[in-house]
A protein has these predicted regions:
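Oxidative protein folding and maturation machinery
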Residues: 1-187
Length: 187
């Protein structure tokens, strides 16, 4: 799984594993349902075991991240923060899309719900500073009936942005609105 978590928009799929590309193709085109389900379970088990959730941004060793936490997202720090915010973005969104397709193809039992919840939580936790993953992750968790984890993801996303001293209300508003909807049972 060399680099599947590090795929970036525009040039990344060339460097992805064949399994990754197959999962993307099958999800987008809605084909090979049984093969997709089996391949996804195998792929996600391997991805999660070989790449712990903090392996992508190595938070404790990231000097730029530590500077941002100390100084906040002001001035040129926003420029330096972009690589942190975008880390894992493509793959996290693909994991959510794959999980959504898997959920639609599988029986809605406790085992499937637990497996899908595990994958969605992994997709978000790969980079908790990427607020663009939190809302679709929470949406899917709520749709499969896991409101508790959906709420936790949104609360973590808001706390992570506050940890970075991010003052951009465009970041907070969708997170807060989705959290309100989940708290009010409107999903």
């Amino acid at each position: 799984l060399d680099g599947d978590l590090n795929i970036i928009q525009g040039r990344g799929l060339f460097f992805a594993t064949p399994e990754y590309n197959k999962l993307c193709y099958w999800t987008r085109n809605r084909v090979n349902e049984e093969e997709f389900k089996n391949a996804l379970v195998t792929y996600m088990d391997k991805l999660i075991s070989e790449n712990p959730v903090d392996s992508l941004i190595k938070e404790e060793h990231d000097q730029v991240l530590n500077m941002i936490k100390k100084e906040g997202l002001k001035g040129q720090m926003q420029f330096f923060a972009q690589h942190i915010f975008e880390a894992g973005n493509v793959t996290a969104h693909n994991i959510i899309a794959w999980t959504d397709y898997f959920w639609k193809l599988s029986p809605s039992d406790k085992k499937t719900k637990a497996l899908c919840s595990k994958w969605i939580n992994y997709a978000y936790n790969v980079n908790r500073f990427n607020n663009k993953v939190a809302v679709p992750a929470a949406d899917l968790l709520a749709r499969i009936g896991n409101f508790k984890d959906a709420k936790i993801i949104l609360e973590k996303a808001i706390a992570s942005q506050k940890e970075l001293k991010n003052e951009d209300q465009k970041v907070y508003k969708p997170l807060e609105l989705k959290l309100r909807d989940i708290n009010n049972g409107k999903l």
